[in-house]
UniProtKB/Swiss-Prot annotation:
The keyword Signal does not apply. Disulfide bonds: none annotated. One of its GO terms (cellular component) is Golgi membrane. One of its GO terms (biological process) is vesicle-mediated transport. This is Golgi apparatus membrane protein TVP15. It is a multi-pass membrane protein. InterPro entries: Golgi_TVP15.
Amino acid sequence: MSENDQKGVKFIRALLVTTGAVATLGFLVQLSEVASEFLAAARACFGLPLSVLLVYLEFRPVPLLQQYASFYYSYMGRALLQLLLAVMLLPAGFFQVCAFTMLFMTGFICAALELSSSAPELPSFRNDGRALSIGAEEDDDMI
């Protein structure tokens, strides 16, 4: 991997971690409004774990995540996830507006990286020999 690719990977990872952290803060603020707006808090209950996984996955692999949520392991999957999180987040406060903007922009950046032929592969995208489908690691022969 060339030096430019390493700088690009570091930048993309920093962007994803920052976006995930700000989105997590935005969903925490949205969750705190459970008394005034229940549906916003319900959306935050779904968005919070998805945004926490965006950050956590950049530092450490999650067991079985690749089998059940393989969209975390491609640029297009992360782009769609970030656009979904942006739609789930109601931009009412400062953190929520920042998170909405960052999620929306990062979603389009990830989609552009998926369509680019020279996009570097992130270390968190590596398969490490695990199967991508449920039960594919078992070698059962049917007779």
